[in-house]
Regions:
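Extracellular "complement/coagulation-type" protease architecture
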Residues: 1-182
C-alpha cells in the first residue's frame, strides 16, 4: 500500500507551493501572525524571501534578501490569493548588517524599515525578540517558544542538510540600536 501512495504522490500534479517545506504541514490560518512574505526586485526579476515582523514598523530577514525595490505582505495565509487580512507595505529602507559578507554569508541579517506601521490584528502581530535551503525560505524565522532564535541564511539547493541560520541573539545590540535610531 505504501509504494502505491508514494507512486501516486509523484504522479499528481504539483501545487504552486509544493516542495518548499519538506516534512511540514499547512499551518492553521493566521496562527503565525508574525510571518512575512518579502518580495524583492533584483535586476528586473521578482525574488521572494520570508521574514518576521519584530515591531510594527520593522521586519527581520536575511541580508541576502536585498534588492532595488522591496515590499512585504503581512497577514497572509495563501499568498496566491488576495485576503482581507493582508497588508501590503512597501519598505522604506533595507538595513543589512554592516559586516554582511555575501561571499561567505556571514552576518546574514537585515532589518527592513516599513514605509508605514503595520496595523496589528488577529492576523498581524510582532514576534518577540530574545531579550536578555529551499527557495523562498531565506530570511524566514527559526522560532522556539514564540521567540525568534534564527534567520534562514543558506542551505544546499537539493534541500538536504546542512542548512545554516543566523543566530539572532548575537545581533541584538545592532538590532536594538538600528531600530531605536530610526
Amino acid at each position: 500500500m505504501q509504494p502505491l501512495v508514494l507512486l501516486l504522490a509523484f504522479l499528481l500534479p504539483p501545487r504552486a507551493e509544493a516542495g518548499k517545506i519538506i516534512g511540514g504541514h499547512e499551518a492553521k490560518p493566521h496562527s503565525r501572525p508574525y510571518m512575512v512574505f518579502v518580495q524583492i526586485l533584483v535586476k528586473e526579476t521578482m525574488k521572494m524571501c520570508g521574514g518576521a515582523l519584530v515591531r510594527e514598523d520593522f521586519v527581520l530577514t536575511a541580508a541576502h534578501c536585498w534588492g532595488s525595490s522591496i515590499s512585504v505582505t503581512l497577514g497572509a495565509h495563501n499568498i496566491q490569493k488576495r485576503e482581507r487580512t493582508q497588508q501590503v507595505i512597501p519598505v522604506r529602507r533595507a538595513i543589512p548588517h554592516p559586516d554582511f559578507n555575501h561571499n561567505n554569508m556571514s552576518n546574514d541579517i537585515m532589518l527592513l524599515e516599513l514605509a508605514r506601521k503595520a496595523k496589528q490584528t488577529v492576523a498581524v502581530r510582532p514576534l518577540s525578540l530574545p531579550w536578555s535551503k529551499a527557495q523562498g525560505d531565506s530570511g524566514s524565522p527559526l522560532i522556539c517558544k514564540n521567540v525568534i532564535q534564527g534567520i534562514v541564511s543558506y542551505g544546499r539547493t537539493d534541500r538536504t542538510p546542512p542548512a545554516a541560520y543566523t543566530k539572532v541573539s548575537s545581533f541584538l545590540p545592532w538590532i536594538k540600536k538600528t531600530m531605536k535610531s530610526l
